[in-house]
């Protein structure tokens, strides 16, 4: 599997560093771990809540599996993050730390008024507060060593708000604002930040999405997942390669995919009226769950 990746050269900004990747059991997180293991001399800490899938990530690395250390961790649990940080920080030995906050979940709940408060808060706890917790745990070390890189995964839904995704959009706009604020705070240091806005990526995030609320049936949920799978245009491997390249170039903002670039452009040109265009595209791509049958 690793020989299919055409990554950047071995002698790079990753050389001798420690890379922490959340959400490394599948999708872009797994691909980043595998590409790093196959092409870079660095220590990789792969984190996820799903232990079996983490073990598969390690196994897929083949002869490079010794570079990947797997750790079961739920970014929604502050105690787990604090315990993980307490065990890892003493082992870093002033090496450059690269933190990739990739873990995320999706929610199929319908409109905001139909979304249970506990489901909304669950998603924010993972997608937004998980990023904040991980950054809070490891940024002091970066400041102490005056080096490092924080990569936070937002989304095209952190560029454009869309219906029936109020929780997800809130979390991804939050990640964007958090990352951009950090960029300003760290401008006089050697610590870099990157905010990533992927478009449709061929990953399992919709397969692990949670259906909640009173307006989303199992059939509608499955139809939405099937439509997303067809509409997703970028492979996880391609997205991972672009994200890792940001560490080499110092790029601070990355929009992935032609669909992502389209949304980025239209929201810049038409910051209010883009809504009508996006609604039409969303209904065409994913269907209109509120249309009368």
Residue ranges, per PLM feature:
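Active-site helix of classical SDR
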Residues: 135, 171
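Conserved glycine-rich Rossmann-like NAD(P)H-binding loop of the short-chain dehydrogenase/reductase
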Residues: 41-55
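Substrate-binding pocket helix/loop in short-chain dehydrogenase/reductase
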Residues: 96, 110-112, 119-121
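Residue(s) in the substrate-gating loop at a strand-loop-helix junction
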Residues: 155
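SDR active-site lid
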Residues: 188-258
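The beta1-alpha1 cofactor-binding region of Rossmann-like NAD(H)/NADP(H)-dependent oxidoreductases
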Residues: 72-83, 117
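Conserved glycine-rich cofactor-binding loop
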Residues: 18, 25-26
């Amino acid at each position: 599997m690793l020989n299919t990746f055409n990554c950047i050269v071995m002698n790079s900004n990753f050389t001798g560093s420690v890379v922490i990747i959340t959400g490394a059991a599948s999708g872009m997180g797994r691909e980043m771990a595998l590409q790093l293991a196959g092409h870079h001399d660095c220590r990789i800490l792969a984190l996820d809540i799903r232990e079996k899938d983490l073990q598969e990530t390690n196994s897929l690395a083949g002869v490079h599996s010794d570079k990947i250390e797997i750790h079961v961790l739920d970014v929604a649990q502050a105690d787990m993050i604090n315990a993980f940080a307490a065990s890892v920080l003493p082992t870093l030995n002033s090496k450059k730390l690269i933190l990739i906050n990739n873990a995320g979940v999706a929610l199929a709940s319908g409109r905001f008024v139909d979304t249970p408060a506990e489901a909304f808060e669950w998603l924010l706890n993972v997608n937004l507060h998980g990023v904040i917790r991980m950054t809070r745990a490891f940024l002091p070390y970066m400041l102490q060593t005056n080096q490092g890189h924080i990569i936070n995964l937002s989304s095209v839904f952190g560029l454009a708000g869309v219906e029936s995704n109020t929780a997800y959009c809130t979390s991804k706009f939050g990640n964007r604002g958090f990352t951009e604020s950090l960029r300003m705070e760290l401008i006089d240091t050697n610590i870099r930040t990157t905010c990533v806005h992927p478009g449709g990526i061929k990953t399992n995030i919709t397969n692990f999405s949670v259906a909640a609320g009173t307006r989303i049936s199992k059939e509608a949920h499955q139809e939405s997942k099937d439509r997303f799978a067809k509409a997703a245009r970028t492979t996880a491997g391609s997205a991972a390669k672009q994200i890792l390249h940001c560490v080499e170039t110092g790029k601070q903002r990355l929009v992935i995919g032609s669909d992502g670039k389209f949304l980025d452009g239209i929201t810049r040109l038409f910051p209010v009226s883009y809504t009508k265009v996006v609604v039409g595209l969303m209904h065409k791509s994913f269907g209109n769950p509120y249309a009368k049958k």
